[in-house]
Regions:
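Glycine-enriched, solvent-exposed interface loops adjoining structured elements
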Residues: 1-35, 46-72, 87-300
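A structural micro-motif recognizing beta-strand termini
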Residues: 39-48, 57, 77-84
Length: 300
């Protein structure tokens, strides 16, 4: 199952045409690595060095100057570490250094999470909880992240191990917090054998991915097959801002680029990827609705 780090690599590879476009790369040669506050960095190669932004791991740094003979980068004091809102962090020796990254890792992660946040209600995560049925009790607490109840069943007594569906229930999204320690409860009106286990499947808003080793399906709650929906959504979001860096008045380099590519090339590519995203989103939505259809039930 893919994790956040693999999704980031997939988006990077797709946006760079697999191997067609390659960022300039060197490596961190400081013995023992660097701390979160070090401003001098030894590197393994002086090729293609330039003043500006570099990326180490998830952190962006602003390089104020460099020394080709001693193979060192000098980071600007104050704002140079954790540049553009990234988090300063220690980095190990031989860590990859990307010079002027086209698509910084933090921006890709944000685009992935923005896509995940936009999926609900077309796509939703699925979770479940269990509790013991009490004949004297009607309302049972549900987890705080519950959005809707999808299916309820209970385990019958005896060796059959059968789980019967429950058809008389009602969800309360404004339950008394003092009574249940949550605002989500389910009222069960079916006749269930006391002491038996009741299982509730419920929908949740997909969770964001935070750490590079976060498992996609395990953390978000989304189906494994929706992975490409998220990567396509991140790709069209990132591509939609490419043209802003090529506006004629921004730099001499932008003027030169405009002689080779039209100024709307990024927007055109973004629209194409967006169409693919919409198609896959619709396909996954139909699959999820087929797996968890709206079930007729009584509310009293």
């Amino acid at each position: 199952m893919p994790n956040l780090g693999q999704l980031v690599s997939e988006v990077q590879s797709n946006l760079q045409g697999y191997t067609l476009r390659q960022d300039r790369i060197t490596w961190l040669a400081t013995p023992g690595g660097i701390s979160a506050t070090d401003l001098t960095i030894q590197i393994g190669s002086a090729d293609n060095l330039a003043k500006g932004i570099v990326q180490i791991g998830n952190e962006l740094l602003w390089v104020n100057s460099f020394d080709r003979q001693n193979l060192t980068l000098n980071v600007a004091p104050g704002f140079g570490r954790g540049y553009m809102g990234t988090t300063p962090s220690p980095h190990a020796q031989n860590a990859q250094i990307i010079l002027t990254p086209t698509f910084p890792v933090t921006m890709i992660q944000q685009a992935l999470n923005d896509t995940i946040n936009s999926l609900y209600p077309k796509l939703f995560g699925v979770a479940n909880t269990t509790f013991q049925y009490n004949a004297a009790q009607i309302a049972y607490p549900l987890p705080d992240d519950t959005r809707d109840v999808l299916f309820i069943s209970w385990q019958t007594p005896g060796p059959s191990k059968e789980w019967l569906p429950t058809n008389r229930w009602r969800i309360d999204r404004m339950a008394n917090v003092a009574a249940f320690n949550t605002t989500k409860t389910v009222n069960i009106y079916d006749k269930i054998v006391p002491g038996r286990t009741v299982q509730v499947y419920y929908s949740i808003i997909p969770n964001n991915l935070t750490n590079l080793n976060d498992d996609f399906a395990g953390v978000t709650g989304l189906p494994e097959s929706s992975r490409d929906v998220v990567t396509l959504g991140a790709a069209y979001r990132l591509l939609s801002y490419i043209d802003t860096g090529r506006i004629n008045l921004s730099s001499a380099e932008a003027d030169l680029a405009d002689t080779k590519l039209p100024s709307t090339a990024g927007a055109s590519a973004s629209k194409y990827i967006f169409a693919l995203y919409q198609q896959r989103l619709q396909e996954e939505s139909v699959k999820l609705q087929d797996r968890f259809p709206i079930r007729v039930h009584y509310t009293k």
